Amino acid sequence: MDYLNNLENNFKEICNECCYKETEKCNYRKCNIGFADYVVRNIKDNSTYSIADGENLIPQDDFKYYEEKAIAKGIANICRLCKECNEGHNENCVIALTRRALEYTQLKDKMEYPGNVILYLMNVSKQKPELAELIKEEYMRIG
């Protein structure tokens, strides 16, 4: 399955629901979904796999409401991408940055990815059990 295309479609759906779409307030540097979409396009277009100090580029002041189920769908696809990756896990890889950008829309604390989806879901459930359950359901559905 093409999880990268799934992510792009997921981001389009989220953006289509946003009241800022195609306005002067629509700026990927200030929007977590816009940032994540930008990173995914760079994976595809430029074969970029890591961004030095990339975590500092993720918008920290995006307080828009995002549908929890749509975010869970994106995170599930990212977890599948991470599982398929053979580059070795690090927090500046584009997959981790995309995941973190989505997490910031739903979770108040930074979430570490331990390299295993089960442990990750356990960590997410400590902050937001309903999000962990949605991620798990989508992860199983697309797998």
Predicted segment positions?
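Cysteine-centered metal-binding/redox modules
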Residues: M1-G143
